[in-house]
Amino acid sequence: MPTKQQSRKSRGRGSTKKKAASPRQKTGRPAEDRALREHLLYLLGGGGAHLDFAKAIAGLPAELRGAEPAGLPFSAWRLLEHMRIAQWDILEFSVNPRHVSPAWPDGYWPESDAPPSDRAWEKSVKEFRRDLKRMQDLVANPRTDLYARIPHGEGQTILREALLAADHNAYHLGQLVLMRRLLGAWRN
């Protein structure tokens, strides 16, 4: 069984052979630091070319949450749960040295195409939003050194993990919109 660190390498988390550096000293450039944090928060919140999570899931009929359009290997439920699990993993890795990631790739996807209940769907939505808010709070906190290597990582930084979360969410939210279009459940 691969170790947590080996598992991270196989998922493209990025690794370096260098030892973790001590936390980066303040640059004395608060305006640039503030601008970077604002940009990251904008991306995490669905700004720019990114899609807002709430808009992507709004109005999706319950009966279509488990539907897979022809030619696509996923349903809205699979995408939602995958995004929730991956975002939770990224966040927990960022803040918890004892965190153990799920097994790759099976641990990042639900077993079924459809949510077992409306309650399961709502719980997943709530947890996704909660963890997104936690990532945003981490980035917004001026005491968070965005550039320092995460001590229990392999060269990752909070900056990198925040960008990873924003990019991963944007990618799969785009898939969700495509799936909804193919099902006739997306408004233009």
Where are each of the predicted segments found?
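Low-complexity, intrinsically disordered/propeptide-like segments
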Residues: 8-9, 43, 63, 135, ...
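Polybasic, lysine-enriched low-complexity intrinsically disordered terminal tails
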Residues: 1-26
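Short, contiguous alpha-helical
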Residues: 17, 23-26, 30-50, 54-57, ...
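Acidic/histidine-rich alpha-helical segments that form the ligand environment
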Residues: 111-149, 160-165
